[in-house]
Amino acid sequence: MTDSKLRIATRKSALAVAQTTMAADAIAAANPGLTYELVSMTTEGDRRLDKSLASFGGKGVFIKELEVALLEGRADIAVHSLKDMPAEVLPQFKLAVVLRREDPRDAFIARGGAAGLKFMDLPAGARVGTGSIRRVVQLKALRPDLEYVPIRGNIQTRLSKLAELDGVVLAAAGLKRMGLADQVTEYFSTEQMLPASGQGILAIETLNVIASHGVAKQSIDSILARVNDAKTYAIAVAEMAYLKALNAGCQFPVASFAEFADAETLMIRGIYWDENKKNLLKSEVSRKMDLSCANVIDVARQIGIELADSICMQLR
């Protein structure tokens, strides 16, 4: 950080830049006099579009270059989609804050856009594109008679596949942040399809030590604290704890979704694909939580672990 300018690492994709700009504007608005600059870069996950994420490293491929920029002092913070982050960050880094969650659902876009056929109305054998094995196992549970085609790339690239597919499934949050919600045919409820852990959440990562460049880490923490959403942070901790407990990443059809059922009750639901039995396991856990308590993060983490334990019992 130089003077009052915050350097923010981001991927170069249009969605990443849009999301990072949203986060940066929120930080600047909460800290009068603070300015920022984006430090954009291309990650391994952006470059290797010819292979599935599971085949060459999973979630970390979208954040490694940004973390290197933090370590080398080229950036003060990094903005990620939480669903792109591994369940546990490396010791030298910290999940500092998260912004309020955007729509966590998955969206179906048919050929023809908003006026196209809804997912359940597609004819047998219709071809639907998605780059997520999590989505595929849940979509197959709804419509085993369809063909699911792997696709990768940015939002526009995936939407262009509609020329050869009958529909695609994308995260609602990205579509809304890119101003493309008007193209959505329908949204899947979280009961129909559980979203990826962390989906719709923007996470801000920092070094976990005092920066050797610019201001102290403590000062950056105080700047970021003004934009943290406490409820979303608790939700993020619970969902990522579930993934960590199952040692899961992009290679596994696994998901969790937490939400506050009321002001003091955090409920988390999870799924896990049992490859041996070809069965989609499901479970849920609820617990009272006081966001004002000092141990709120520990409680959120424990809720995620309890959910994972419940799933593991079904695997025995």
Model regions and ranges:
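Short, well-ordered beta-strand segments
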Residues: 7-9, 78, 96, 129, ...
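Small-molecule-sensing regulatory modules
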Residues: 2-48, 55, 141-316
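Short, structured active-site "lid" loops
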Residues: 50-77
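Short glycine-rich anion-binding loops that position phosphate/pyrophosphate groups of nucleotides
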Residues: 82-85, 173-175
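Paired acidic/hydrophobic, glycine-rich loop segments that form the ligand-binding mouth/hinge
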Residues: 71, 76-80, 166-171
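A conserved helix-loop-strand patch within extracytoplasmic ligand-binding domains
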Residues: 82-83, 91-145, 208
